[in-house]
Amino acid sequence: MSSSQTLVVKLGTSVLTGGSRRLNRAHIVELVRQCAQQHAAGHRIVIVTSGAMAAGREHLGYPELPPTIASKQLLAAVGQSRLIQLWEQMFSIYGIHIGQMLLTRADLEDRERFLNARDTLRALLDNHIVPVINENDAVATAEIKVGDNDNLSALAAILAGADKLLLLTDQQGLFTADPRNNPQAELIRDVRGIDDDLRALAGDSVSGLGTGGMATKLQAADIACRAGIDTIIAAGSRPGVIGDVIASHPVGTCFHALETPLENRKRWIFGAPPAGELVVDDGALSAILERGSSLLPKGIREISGNFSRGEVIRIRSLQGRDVAHGVSRYNSDAMRMIAGHHSQQIGEILGYEYGPVAIHRDDMIVS
């Protein structure tokens, strides 16, 4: 088996309905089977699903509603519960639990809420639960909507620390022209860097029941690739498409990231000006440098500056040596309260906890 990968799979309305007005259960069953197969092989799968409005419209018997935001939110409110129930039923066949996450732009733009969403998503994955993500269309206004699930899936891939993002659609990938009206159109296999010429190829096509077209998929690919995540646009009807993407077989159009997620994260941590500083004792210093450990509150001697949870801070030794930079799990006020204490005491001291470490090893770059 190849090393474990984290794959975000985005399923658009056109894939879930097969181009009809109702959810195509047989098609969804096959996609879940593929996901379950990769889950059993040790890979981590995240689903970003569209289809709430389509499910709501089907459940209500295709009512004639005015094309207003309120009507769309009504359909989403009715359909979301039906949609998540369908995913739950399908994955339960394979003994796999799912966890629903409904997000809005506000959840991803506010640092504290972003970190909470990230922690929830990664906790689901760590416990072998498949996250099923959708935008919270029933309450989202234009000001707080991500806008489409293509861009939402790119943000979910960043939250999950994904290796790859797979955008499944009713097309094989990105073509040199629209294949529906140009028989000479050729599939573009590999893309390294998205420019205006490529965006022009994407056009503004949108399926009848969805909100995304090829243009939004390019936006999503650009976001993900900038974060070090390879992105693939492929046909949801292609047999074994999910396994082929995991195995890095040629599928659809692959947008290659110019750097790995780790390299991207290192660049961000090194480049961010430290918002504060921690001085650690010799035991913590040894654990960080010699054993590659996380920084525990017990080893913190001094704290300087005022910083928020999720900001980059500097770690120094008692002798003043610049040891590392890392992302703080706690704000400066909380850090001052737990410094010098055992991790088991964090919850008792603060009344809450974001885990046993002050800075996790995965969020730390040694100088």
From Swiss-Prot:
Source superkingdom: Bacteria
Stored InterPro entries: AceGlu_kinase-like_sf, Asp/Glu/Uridylate_kinase, G5K_ProB, Glu/AcGlu_kinase, Glu_5kinase, Glu_5kinase/COase_Synthase, Glutamate_5-kinase_CS, PUA
Signal peptide extent: none
Binding-site list for substrate: 50, 137, 149
Positions with a binding annotation for ATP: 10, 169-170, 211-217
Any single Gene Ontology cellular-component annotation: cytosol
Matches recorded under Pfam families: AA_kinase, PUA
Annotated catalysed reactions: L-glutamate + ATP = L-glutamyl 5-phosphate + ADP
Annotated EC: 2.7.2.11
Function: Catalyzes the transfer of a phosphate group to glutamate to form L-glutamate 5-phosphate.
Family, similarity comment: Belongs to the glutamate 5-kinase family.
NCBIfam families hit by this protein: proB
Name this polypeptide is given: Glutamate 5-kinase
